[in-house]
Amino acid sequence: MTKKIITLVGRPNVGKSTLFNRLSIRKKAIVHDLPGVTRDRKYTDGKIGSFEFLLIDTPGLEENPDNMGERLMGQTTQAILEADLICFMVDGKSGVLPDDKLLSNFVRKYNKHCILVVNKCEKAFDFDKEYYKLGFDSIVIISAEHGIGLIDLYDAIISKLSVEESIERNIADPFRGDCLQIVVSGRPNAGKSTFINAIINDERLLTGPEAGITRESIEVDWQYKNTHIKLIDTAGLRKKSTITASLEKLSTSDTINSIKFANTVILMIDALAHVKQQDFNIASHIVNEGRSIIIVVNKWDLVKESEKEAFQKEFYYQINTHLPQIKGVPVLFISAINKQNIEQVLDACLKIYKIWNKKITTNKLNKWLDFTTKIHPLPLQKCGRRVRIKYMTQIKTRPPTFKLFSNNPGKITDSYTRYLVNNMRDAFDMHGIPIRFTYVKNKNPYV
């Protein structure tokens, strides 16, 4: 089978060559902060799991080119014509510039599959609606230099190219330059820093009884069961009405940004403070961002033995009531200060990370769909024809996202979607992660 071709396009110095080196087997391009380092289009072989492709790096495009610029434009145009997919790159630090808008119009006229890649987003990043105005329906946020967000880019590439072959993922090193990023989040003084100190067996992070000691997200690299883990301690998330100081507003923004880039988020709850609506708000935000989540109840050693059973019963009831979208989410009860059940938390993170990356073949999905819809059929329409879901396929992982084709998608109720999602969790062992369904209409309404 002929290899698919992916071309990197963008104005100078947005990080095309850095991403080229990340995706290729060997470093081929020279990387420098000066614009215009790449003068010719460069080719290399790339590979994602079992999916191999040809990757092209192009010269940076600039408006009003001189003679050299015209020749570079010719190089880039040829690379676009050869491409099955274009990664149009912009600089997340500088935002959308006039050249980006002009060049996006130039690229889109070729009607190629495109992904907008917002690069250099290793620090706090405020997503600007201007990015949508560039006209691309698929947007991925990354840092090519630091290896952040690359798997999201890989999944977008697989989705755009409709590659349905199995992508084998090694949990210790899913792709070059990536690691398992675990963010520890929660309300202030839940014991987040103490928990990370317990894992690394070192007083690396400042702790104390005062709420709000951690003011910024702090990263700690760790190795666990041959897995490279980046532990990220965050500032506690308060209700908006209680955030007054400008520094704490910045800290909260930093925490929200860390969650966006996380693979797994540990939501830490103080057993003595009990579960509050703010905890559910944080959990909902994590799920809406599509992250996998573990709920950890800390300070379990301070709860009276006679009260623990009733506490757990009420806690599970609250979780199932307020967070039905992550049915079966792992819940662990620990004492960070006594290092009780710490390894169980890390084991749960490894397990749910694997589920979050799960890829189900189209054949298995449609056998399951046929069986499930026969057990509980969709309703009849007023015209007498039954609403049907004819076919489905997985369009991405992280979180698992599925496209379902129906003769009348508008008639599929939320309750029926919940039925399908919950049945899928049981059938494919996908408990505790967000699962997303999107419905599209069949071209033929009578099937």
Swiss-Prot record:
Residues that hold GTP 2 according to the record: 186-193, 233-237, 298-301
User: Per the database record, which ranges form the KH-like domain?
Assistant: 358-443
In this chain, GTP 1 is annotated as bound at 10-17, 57-61, 119-122
Q: Which InterPro entries does the protein's record reference?
A: G_ENGA, GTP-bd, GTPase_Der, KH_dom-like, KH_dom-like_a/b, P-loop_NTPase, Small_GTP-bd
MF-aspect GO terms: GTP binding
Annotated ranges, domain EngA-type G: 4-165, 180-357
Under SUPFAM superfamilies, the record lists: P-loop containing nucleoside triphosphate hydrolases
One GO BP on record is:
ribosome biogenesis
Keywords carried by this UniProt record: GTP-binding, Nucleotide-binding, Repeat, Ribosome biogenesis
Q: What does this protein do?
A: GTPase that plays an essential role in the late steps of ribosome biogenesis.
The similarity comment for this entry is:
Belongs to the TRAFAC class TrmE-Era-EngA-EngB-Septin-like GTPase superfamily. EngA (Der) GTPase family.
Q: Which HAMAP family match?
A: GTPase_Der
Complex formation: Associates with the 50S ribosomal subunit.
Entry protein name: GTPase Der
